[in-house]
A protein has these predicted regions:
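Substrate-binding groove of N-acetylhexosamine-processing glycoside hydrolases
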Residues: 1-264
Length: 264
């Protein structure tokens, strides 16, 4: 406002064009959160005349962001925490048209926790994903590389990966038909990545037990499953892209664990 009224000019409310949740700069991903970093709390609404979002190529998952923008325009949130709660409710409304949880909306939201980050450089707003899982991944890897006992951490990660796989399988089988038609590539990628991680965790256990045969079998199985996870391609305007889930923390953890097993 100060810039636009310099020299005594009259202020006219502006319309905002927000480059979110567009994935033109990170084509292999979906962005299913992060609105709190663009639609800021406690903004003077009299300064704005409108908000326009730049959506993803995929219209159905773009509805998560559209729900947040509609809520923001109707009743502006007061904190980032409130904005995140709105984003959580969006999965319910987009899935069933209701604000309450359903089995499939909960599964979709669980997957959405790992489809937020743009995986880009400092030119764009950094969006954090896998917020709850990331510290667990880091703790396991740190202890594993230090040669410490990771049995408890391994069991916890097995449960986390099994939960994500189950969510992807459930949504693939029973989720909203129009949504599934646009995101099944990421569901398949998630299932294969979780299976690959399970195999690599088996390999980490084999290292502790000095079981070279099981180590090799687990490593090879995980390697093939990861390679398979990279085969789910979709048309992006005029070329094919590979769908990827968990680009910020899950995939780097998988690749790091693969290297640990490979060196053994």
């Amino acid at each position: 406002k100060n810039n636009l009224t310099a020299g005594g000019k009259t202020y006219r409310p502006v319309s905002l064009w927000i480059n979110w949740p567009v994935t033109d700069n990170s084509k292999q991903h979906l962005i299913l959160g992060g609105g709190e970093k663009f639609l800021h709390p406690n903004v003077d609404p009299s300064l704005l005349s409108g908000i326009m979002l730049n959506p993803m190529q995929q219209s159905e998952p773009s509805k998560i962001a559209l729900f947040s923008a509609a809520q923001y325009a109707w009743k502006q949130w007061k904190s980032e925490e409130e904005a995140k709660k709105v984003n959580d409710i969006a999965f319910n409304f987009v899935e069933t048209g209701k604000f309450t949880d359903s089995e499939t909306s909960v599964a979709f939201r669980e997957l959405g926790k790992h489809m937020i980050n743009q995986n880009m450089d400092g030119r764009v707003v950094k969006l954090e994903e896998s917020v709850e899982l990331a510290p667990k991944l880091a703790a396991f890897m740190s202890k594993l590389k230090a040669g410490q006992d990771v049995n408890a951490e391994r069991q916890e990660l097995r449960a986390e990966f099994a939960k994500l796989k189950a969510a992807a399988q459930l949504y693939k089988a029973s989720g909203d038909e129009k949504m599934r038609a646009q995101i099944h590539y990421w569901l398949d990628n998630a299932i294969d990545q979780m299976d690959a991680l399970s195999a690599f965790l088996d390999g980490s256990e084999a290292i502790e037990n000095n079981d070279s045969a099981r180590l090799w079998d687990s490593y090879y199985k995980g390697l093939k499953l990861y390679e398979q996870s990279q085969t789910y391609t979709f048309l992006y305007v005029d070329h094919d892209e590979r769908a990827e889930l968990g680009v910020q923390h899950i995939r780097p953890f998988l690749l790091g664990l693969r290297e640990v097993l490979a060196t053994e």
